[in-house]
């Protein structure tokens, strides 16, 4: 009954929220001031930055008279290397980002006082948008105590015909379709894609906008037809869109039906139909804000149901699982960033949050039909930059469910990871990454697997599984100056991996695995999509008769 009431409330909330979304009102044109003079920008904007901070600081607390926005094409036709017919054609085909799309996302507006920190944050958030390659701000004109700002952005290529095939962990996959990450210049994502892999085929339909109708609302509508089920998701949210946002609220509803196939190596251990229904709604408030950090308090309610049924290969069904609980959450967000180049991408600036961040969510409610539970979901991370060429990142997480009837943990998992980057020089990097995960009373579909899908290169998908896992990756990376056709950046990597996954009490049956190999990395310099193509040749150093001497994989990753 509670779940039905909750679902109805979500429906009513969605209708009311959707009705409240409206475009920003049009402001009347202001009178032009007199005695205006251009501002001489004597110092160029430093590489890896988006504004001359020193020059901007001189205008702190002065009024912004006007903000001019210039949106440049993807290809720079003033550059002879890019002034070719194919690039000029691409510039004509691409629908440039609309000025209103950019203006509606700025954290400052005409008539505001110049706030350097807020302007820098706004530029950083704009740069993260998939449809922009570059963002710069210049001081253009002064009119007494008024200042005019020039915002200059460069569009990214966002129309992506998806015709691809990959081979990873001994399994093949393919995609065919079309995706536009900046539909008609609105900043919205629209996709229609057909996908196949070893488990299933599916057709994805998706619309997502982080500034729905040029407002601060995020909206996503997703549907997928699966060969073994379907997936539907709706998100409507007014998030914390800046460090200084005081209120946030929203909801998400998702249903997923698919056949889970439990594999270990070449063996199919079990299979069953799995239906997941999840609903989540929250309300949040920023408690304390300063230039270094922001604290927030969120409250919400979550309902999750897992149901299972037989298919032809079913050996044993997991127990059904129902959760319905209210929760409260405290968050700490760092507001300090450091910009790096040649980190996760090739020749592209990246803003890395420096300092401590955490979130702690505690909830109580129903577990199954007759039991109650306490749930703890927590995350902590800390990034530390030392001497300009050392970057450390530490993360830990926990997701615990304590059932009151059994007085024990159920379907719980926790772990920690660390990552170290050492900058040898402008083109060469060392990266060491290590992680450990531990589960307790995990159902099969949530067990920890080890194979190429989690970075254990040279081994098939889900080669080992259990409730314990560790993995260590050591990489020597090379970020070259090669720029094929002014489109594709090229990098290379040599790597060694080690790891193991095993079941508690049965560890002697799982070997410690190791592999070594070489790889190429290809990254588009004109696309805002963070995808990186991985081409790896890896050899397992610990193997059995089932494994080949080497494994060639071609896959798309989210970073180098």
Please provide the spans of the model-predicted regions.
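Conserved GTPase G-domain substructure that encodes guanine base recognition and part of the catalytic core
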Residues: 414
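Immediate N-terminus of the mature polypeptide
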Residues: 2-15, 23-407, 420-560
């Amino acid at each position: 009954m509670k779940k039905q009431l909750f679902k109805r409330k979500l429906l009513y909330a969605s209708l009311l929220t959707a009705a409240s979304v409206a475009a920003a009102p049009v402001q009347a044109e202001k009178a032009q001031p007199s005695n205006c003079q251009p501002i001489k920008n004597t110092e160029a904007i430093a590489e890896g930055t988006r504004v001359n901070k020193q020059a901007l600081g001189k205008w702190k607390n002065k009024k912004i008279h006007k903000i001019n926005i210039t949106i440049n094409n993807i290809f720079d036709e003033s550059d002879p290397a890019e002034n070719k017919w194919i690039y000029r054609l691409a510039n004509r085909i691409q629908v440039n980002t609309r000025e209103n799309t950019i203006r509606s996302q700025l954290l400052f507006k005409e008539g505001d006082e110049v706030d350097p920190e807020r302007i820098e944050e706004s530029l950083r958030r704009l740069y993260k948008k998939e449809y922009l390659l570059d963002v710069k701000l210049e001081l253009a004109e002064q009119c007494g105590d008024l200042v005019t700002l020039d915002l200059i952005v460069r569009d990214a290529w966002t129309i992506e015909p998806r015709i691809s095939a990959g081979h990873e962990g001994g399994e093949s996959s393919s995609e065919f379709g079309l995706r536009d990450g900046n539909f008609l210049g609105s900043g919205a994502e629209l996709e229609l894609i057909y996908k196949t892999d070893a488990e299933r085929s599916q057709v994805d339909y998706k619309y997502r906008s982080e500034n729905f109708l040029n407002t601060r609302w995020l909206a996503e509508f997703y549907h997928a037809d699966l060969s073994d089920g379907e997936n539907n998701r709706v998100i409507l949210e007014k998030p914390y869109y800046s460090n200084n946002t005081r209120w946030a609220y929203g909801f998400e509803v998702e249903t997923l039906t698919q056949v889970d196939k439990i594999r270990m190596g070449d063996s199919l251990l079990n299979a069953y139909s799995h239906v997941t229904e999840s609903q989540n709604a929250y309300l949040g408030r920023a408690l304390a804000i300063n230039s270094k950090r922001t604290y927030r308090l969120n409250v919400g309610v979550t309902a999750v149901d897992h149901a299972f049924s037989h298919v032809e290969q079913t050996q044993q069904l997991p127990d059904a699982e129902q959760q319905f609980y209210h929760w409260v959450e405290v968050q700490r967000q760092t507001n300090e960033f450091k910009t790096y180049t040649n980190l996760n991408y090739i020749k592209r600036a990246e803003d890395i949050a420096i300092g401590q961040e955490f979130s702690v969510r505690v909830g109580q409610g129903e577990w199954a039909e007759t039991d109650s539970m306490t749930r703890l979901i927590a995350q902590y991370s800390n990034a530390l930059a030392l001497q300009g060429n050392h970057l450390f990142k530490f993360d830990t997480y926990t997701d615990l469910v304590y059932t009151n009837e059994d007085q024990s943990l159920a379907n719980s998992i926790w772990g920690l990871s660390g990552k170290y980057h050492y900058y040898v020089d402008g083109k060469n990097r060392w990266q060491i990454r290590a992680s450990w995960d531990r589960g307790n009373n995990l159902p099969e579909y949530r067990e920890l697997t080890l194979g190429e899908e989690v970075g254990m290169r040279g081994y098939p998908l889900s080669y080992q599984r259990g409730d314990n896992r560790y993995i260590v990756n050591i990489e020597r990376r090379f970020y070259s100056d090669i720029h094929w056709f002014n489109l594709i950046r090229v990098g290379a990597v040599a790597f060694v991996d080690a790891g193991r996954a095993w079941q508690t009490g049965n560890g002697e049956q799982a070997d410690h695995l190791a592999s070594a190999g070489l790889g190429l990395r290809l990254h588009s310099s004109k696309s805002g999509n963070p995808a990186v193509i991985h081409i790896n040749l890896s050899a397992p150093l610990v193997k059995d008769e089932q494994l080949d001497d080497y494994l060639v994989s071609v896959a798309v990753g989210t970073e180098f």
